[in-house]
Amino acid sequence: MERGILLRQLVEAEQSVAESKAFIAQQQRLIVQSERDGQDAAETIRLLGKLLLLHQSREQERARILDELFGAS
């Protein structure tokens, strides 16, 4: 694939990884707050699990792009 396209994809992947990290941190804060306030955090915890899977997928995509850019095997 053309290097310019890969670089653009890498920028997008980096942004996605950063966004998912921020969402995970926010969700973790909500869990702590809910538990501290005596509220049920089950749904918040389930959502955190989904966010962690999404983050893992985004990191894998970033790694794939880096491999393609720099020829790592």
Show the residue positions of the predicted features.
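Anionic, Ser/Thr-rich low-complexity intrinsically disordered regions
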Residues: 1-73
